[in-house]
From Swiss-Prot:
UniProt-listed InterPro entries: Class_I_gatase-like, CTP_synthase, CTP_synthase_N, GATASE, GATase1_CTP_Synthase, P-loop_NTPase
Taxonomy, superkingdom: Archaea
Keywords assigned: ATP-binding, Glutamine amidotransferase, Ligase, Magnesium, Metal-binding, Nucleotide-binding, Pyrimidine biosynthesis
A UniProt-annotated Pfam family: GATase
Protein's gene: pyrG
Protein name (Swiss-Prot/TrEMBL): CTP synthase
């Protein structure tokens, strides 16, 4: 039977509970243990696919096509695993499943209630997700005291009752510091633990989030009022990169605590590659300004995996990518913003809908004509095709039918399999697809392979009817879907580095295994800057 580490949060949201959960997993992975991770989101949405990026941040796409919470991205990057969509559990999924079972008659006439039917469904899914692993990390989203959390807290309380010492509770809470006196105030944390105990859960360990390291007096107070031994109180204070958090907690003894408390057999921890990555990340020899052009740039979390993929590539190249966020809506109003941005490379980001797209197209044009290394991702590739069709091929009204259904030159249009789709949720082209790479191209040089498997999330595609004309004008299609004829990668050989993809390369980037397209972008930017 696998062990469970359940991570809860208190005092306020946005503490980095997901990073702590991922760090716990990294600590156990460093000991050679097999680890998976589950994120519980108490909202009633079935998944994150239709949620506003400003509310939810990035939608992380799993290999099997799940549209999930961005914390699954943290888990995959820290644990170096690929997680299935079932590892993101929402209230919407739970209630939908219970109601469907009731309609089928699975409950044999019982009165269906939160306890036991909803809590049993939650436990069933947790045990299913944990199957075959030594340890499952379970993060419960939200803050203790939220109404939406109650069924999940009750379910993990029951899980502890049933499995005993195979379930360990870690509570993450904020301890502010009063700047006028320099005193750490532990009362909010004490109250959040008291609230957790009201639901029958006593934390086994506490992770204190704080701006700077807490003092011994604060540890004593937390131990006394939270009823947690001092050796089980850990401090995740602010650091310059989230990738230092596992090392920080390891130095405080969390690894030994987890192994002893859960009765695990693990080897001596090995952080060799991880420490090397963190060292390179923290002390690069040069900086590169990377323009990030998109429509949701006020909330960088909307592009979290792309940001992390650039950091991974930067660490490998001894370069720090300094991100310059470019609001495409503002570019529409004032294209002169682009020369003033002073970027060494340009990424045109994913997105949906008409707002701000002309500004994104202008970012493509600027990068193409000024010979700035360029990477377009998903929507960014589609808009790169639109820009090329307008300004090189001479089709002035070229567009995507997503943006202008009546365009006379639909160089991007709805994928055929999407024409009969009548629901938004979970209906896009999602998850892993095989991409064949054309020999002799930039893509082939970057990937050093003839085939790659990449994750997708889109409805629209390049219109094959226009591909011959685009190619005649100098655009090269360097990647095709293997199972259907679909453009996956485009590039411009006459440009120092201009490449764009229909797929999302960022979702498979790992700290010690950066993806080729991001390495290529930063390498080209470094080479350009030397000139």
């Amino acid at each position: 039977m696998p062990k469970f580490v359940v991570v809860t949060g208190g005092v306020m949201s946005g503490l980095g509970k997901g990073v702590v959960a991922a760090s716990v997993g990294r600590i156990l992975r460093a000991r050679g243990l097999s680890v998976t991770a589950v994120k519980i989101d108490p909202y009633l949405n079935v998944d994150a696919g239709t949620m506003n990026p400003y509310q939810h941040g990035e939608v992380f796409v799993t290999f099997d096509g799940g549209e999930t919470d961005l914390d699954l991205g943290h888990y995959e990057r820290f644990l170096d695993v690929e997680l299935p969509h079932r590892n993101n559990i929402t209230s919407g999924q739970i209630y939908k499943s219970v109601i469907e079972k009731e309609r089928r008659g699975d409950y044999l006439g019982q009165t269906v209630q939160l306890i036991p039917h909803v809590t049993d469904e939650i436990k069933r899914r947790l045990v299913e997700a944990a199957g075959g692993f030594d340890v499952a990390i379970v993060e419960i989203g939200g803050t203790v005291g939220d109404y939406e959390q109650l069924p999940f807290l009750e379910a993990v309380r029951q899980l502890r009752l049933e499995l005993g010492g195979d379930v360990l509770f870690v509570h993450v809470a904020w301890v502010p510091i009063l700047k006028t006196t320099g005193e750490f105030k532990t009362k909010p944390l004490q109250h959040s633990v008291a609230e957790l105990r009201r639901y029958g859960i006593q934390p086994d360990a506490v992770v204190v989030r704080s701006e700077r390291p807490i003092d011994a007096n604060a540890v004593k107070k937390i131990s006394l009022f939270a009823h947690v031994p001092q050796h089980a109180i850990f401090n995740s204070y602010d650091v310059d990169t989230i990738y230092k958090v596992p090392l920080l907690l390891e130095r405080q003894g969390m690894g030994d605590f987890l192994v002893e408390r859960l009765r695990l057999r693990g080897r001596s921890p090995d952080y060799g590659e991880w420490e090397s990555f963190v060292a390179r990340l923290s002390a690069p020899s040069r900086k590169i300004a990377v323009g990030m052009c998109g429509k949701y740039v006020e909330l960088p979390d909307a592009y979290l995996s792309i940001v992390e993929a650039l950091r991974h590539a930067g660490a490998a190249l001894d370069v720090r990518p300094e991100l310059v966020w470019i609001n495409s809506v503002e570019v529409e109003k004032n294209p002169d913003l682009l020369p003033k941005a002073g970027v060494d490379a340009m990424v045109v980001l994913p997105g949906f809908g008409k707002r701000g797209t002309e500004g994104m197209i202008e970012c493509v044009r600027y990068a193409r004509t000024e010979k700035i290394p360029f990477l377009g991702i998903c929507f960014g590739m589609q808009l790169a095709v639109v820009e090329f069709a307008r300004n090189v091929l001479g089709l002035r009204d070229a567009n995507s039918t997503e943006l202008d259904p009546q365009t006379p030159h639909p160089v991007v249009h709805l994928a055929p399999e999407q024409e009969s789709v009548d629901v938004l949720g979970g209906s896009m082209i999602l998850g892993n697809r095989e991409v064949e790479i054309v020999p002799g191209t930039l893509a082939a040089a970057l990937y050093k392979a003839s085939l790659t498997v990449e994750r997708h999330r889109h409805r629209f595609e390049v219109n094959l009817a226009y591909v011959p004309k685009l190619q005649e004008a100098g655009l090269v299609v360097s990647g095709w879907r293997r199972d259907v004829k679909r453009v996956e990668i485009i590039e411009l050989p006459a440009h120092p580095y201009f490449i764009a993809t229909q797929f999302h390369p960022e979702f498979k980037s790992r700290p010690t295994r950066p993806r080729p397209l991001f390495l290529g972008l930063l390498s080209a930017a470094v080479e350009q800057s030397r000139r």
